[in-house]
Amino acid sequence: MRPTSGCSKDDTIQKQNRRHNTVDNKQEKLPLSIEIFLNKQINKISFDTIRSKQNCRLKEIYCRLKIRCRLKKKFIKSLSKKIISYHFISFHTIVVLLLLPPFSHLLVLVYPSVFTTAFYHQKWALRLNPCLPTYFFHRQRQCVTLLIRNANENMRARRVNSVMLTKPKQFLFLLEFITLFIFTYCL
C-alpha cells in the first residue's frame, strides 16, 4: 500500500511552517546585551522623569515652607518682644512696690520667685518659635528629611538667639537682686 498524497502534503506543510517559525524567531530575538541595555535605558528614562517631578514638588513645598516660616518668625518675634517688654514693666513695678515701707520686709521672700518667673517667661517667649508645620510630616513623606534638616538649622539658630538674649538679662537680674538684698539688710 502506498501512502496517500494528502498525508505527505500535510507533512511537508508542517515542515515548512517549522522552518518559517525558526527563521522568524531568529530574526525577532535580539542579543542579550542589547536587550539588557534597552531595558536599562527605559528604566532610566522613567526613573529620571519621576525623580524630576519629585524634585519639582519638593522645591515647591520647600518654597512654601520658607515663606510660612518667615511669616511665623515675624509674628512670633513681635509677640515675644511684647511678652518680654510686658514682663519687664510688671517686674519693675513689683520691685518698686516692694521697696515701699510696708512691703519692704517681704522683699527677700518674694524677689527670688519673681526672679525665677522672669526666666520662665523669657524661655516661653523663645520657645514660641515652632518653625515647622507638623501636618507636612503626614502629608509628604518625601519631605521629612528636608524638614528635619530645616529643624536642625532652626534649633541651632534658636540656641544662638537664646544665649544672646539670656546672658545680659541674667547679669542685670543678678545685679538688681544683689543691690536690693544689700539695700534691705543695710536698712
Curated annotation (Swiss-Prot):
Region (Disordered): 1-24
Membrane-traversing stretches: 83-105, 163-183
Keywords assigned: Cytoplasm, Meiosis, Membrane, Nucleus, Transmembrane, Transmembrane helix
Cellular compartments annotated: Cytoplasm; Nucleus membrane
Topology in membrane: Multi-pass membrane protein
GO cellular component terms given for this protein: cytoplasm; nuclear membrane
Gene Ontology biological process terms from the UniProt entry: meiotic cell cycle
Function: Has a role in meiosis.
Protein name stated in the entry: Meiotically up-regulated gene 155 protein
The organism of origin for this protein: Schizosaccharomyces pombe (strain 972 / ATCC 24843) (Fission yeast)
